[in-house]
Structure formats: C-alpha cells, structure tokens
C-alpha cells in the first residue's frame, strides 16, 4: 500500500498536480471499526504532499457525513441519508451537459441496445430498395447510400431523430455494401463524436433483422472511440447475433480485446476515408 505522498511522487497528470484543494471521500464497509486511523493517515499524507484538504467525507451504510464540519445540525454523528441517485444535483448537472446516466447493471445496458418496436413502414420500404450488387448501377447506388447517410446525420443533428422512413431504408440496405459501410465508419469526426454516437445507436435500434450487423459494427467503433469499451462489446454481440459470420465484427472484437488507444480510429479515418470517398464519388465529394 502506498501513502498519498508516495502516490504523489508517481506520474500524476498535470491536472491533478495543479489542483489547489483536495476532496477526500472514504467509503467504509459496515464491518470496519478502525477506518478513522486510515483516514487520518491519508489526510496527513495529503497535507504533507501540499494538497490542502478542503473536505473529508465518509460514506457508510448509505449515509454520509463530513469529518470537518462541526455543525451537528448539518452533519450529525449518525450522518445524513444519501440522496437518490436520480435526484442528486450532480446527476442533473451531468444530464444538462449531455452525459447519459450510467446503467445500473449489464441487463440495463443490453436492453438499451435492443431494437425499438417494429416499424412496418421501414420494413415495407426496404423491400422496394435493391441492394448494390455488382452491376452497371452499383456505383450510382453506392453514391445514393453515402448521400443518404449525410442527409440522415444532418436530420439527426437538427431534430435528434430522422422521420424520413425511405431515407432510413436506403441506408440500411446500402450499408450491406462494404464501401457504403466504410463510408459511414469514416464519416465520423472527433468533434461530432457525440452526434454520431447518438445517431448510429438510434439507427441500429431501428434496423430490422438481417440489417443490423453493418450499422452495429460501425456503432461499436464509435463506442470504443468514445471510451465506452463495455458497450462496444455488447454492440458487437448484436452484430454477430444478426450475422455470425460478419467479418468486420470479428475483427473489431479482436481489436477491442487488445486495449489499444481509441485514437487509432481517428488515424485510420484520416488515411482511409479519402480513398473511400474517391472510390464512391470518383473524387467529386467535397467535405
């Protein structure tokens, strides 16, 4: 076990080293009786490392109190009950910043990725749209798919939803083509990562059976780049459930398991996306 001072001597980030004050929060199991000894030693170590202690809180048996506050009305010895997570001020602040609440368990996460209710209009539209295939019209169909993706993102950015069922159907059918799928993957930008995260998740949940794997695999990469590694794996579960032989999903599963930095996707886009655009639009697409 390292003291706070020994930790301080390690490779702290510049943000931590530049901190003016410290907040110490100690979560104590019900069965522990000598926590005050550890907390006192840790507090003294922080002070000696030039991290002034602004507040020290203990949390035990779903109650909390301050070790610094001397007001018995504010911080009685028995502590105050913890607020409900959904009602806490920090929860409201995070939601206002666009950050979703964490999932309570793996089942909640899985359910958040499941398909929405069946949309019969989309399924009907899908039957009218031919796949790209290798034909004289393949290039035109790929262009149609890429342009539909651009329109979809614009709609989603404006309204948080896409109401054009024909457009959604075109995307889902065209993304069975590898070039259109790669265009969707390469269109993501770090500056608009949250937009693509929300849009591709929504599109995946709209997709009927046999059309999930391409969009789910693309969405898994966005999850990974966003730092949502567990979600990325669960999204791949959906992709492989839809198509057990989907090659890119298997490749991403192996890649995610290596724990490599998410930034690698930005590097890949920078190198590959211009080539994909050129292949689809013959260099005519201006981005």
Across the structure, where does each feature detected by a protein language model lie?
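Single conserved hydrophobic/aromatic residue that forms the stacking wall/gate
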Residues: 1-17
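Charged, compositionally biased boundary regions
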Residues: 13-14, 19-258, 262-287
């Amino acid at each position: 076990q390292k003291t706070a001072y020994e930790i301080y001597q390690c490779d702290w980030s510049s943000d931590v080293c530049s901190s003016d004050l410290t907040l110490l929060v100690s979560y104590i199991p019900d069965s522990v009786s000598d926590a005050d000894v550890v907390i006192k030693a840790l507090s003294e170590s922080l002070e000696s490392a030039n991290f002034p202690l602004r507040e020290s809180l203990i949390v035990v048996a779903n109650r909390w109190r301050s070790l610094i506050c001397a007001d018995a009305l504010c911080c009685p010895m028995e502590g105050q009950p913890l607020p409900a997570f959904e009602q806490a001020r920090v929860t409201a602040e995070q939601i206002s910043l666009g950050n979703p609440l964490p999932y309570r368990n793996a089942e909640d996460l899985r359910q958040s990725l499941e398909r929405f209710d069946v949309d019969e209009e989309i399924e009907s539209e899908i039957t009218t749209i031919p796949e790209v295939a290798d034909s004289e019209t393949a290039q035109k169909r790929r262009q149609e798919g890429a342009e539909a993706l651009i329109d979809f993102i614009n709609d989603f950015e404006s309204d948080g939803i896409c109401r054009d069922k024909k457009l959604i159907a075109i995307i889902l059918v065209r993304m069975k083509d590898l070039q259109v799928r790669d265009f969707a993957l390469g269109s993501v930008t770090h500056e608009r990562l949250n937009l693509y995260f929300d849009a591709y998740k929504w599109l995946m949940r709209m997709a009927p059976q046999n059309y999930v794997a391409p969009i789910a695999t693309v969405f898994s990469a966005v999850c990974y780049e966003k730092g949502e590694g567990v979600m990325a794996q669960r999204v791949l579960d959906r992709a492989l459930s839809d198509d057990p032989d989907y090659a890119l999903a298997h490749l991403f599963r192996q890649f995610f398991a290596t724990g490599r930095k998410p930034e690698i996707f930005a590097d890949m886009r920078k190198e590959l996306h211009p080539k994909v655009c050129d292949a689809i639009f013959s260099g005519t697409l201006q981005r």
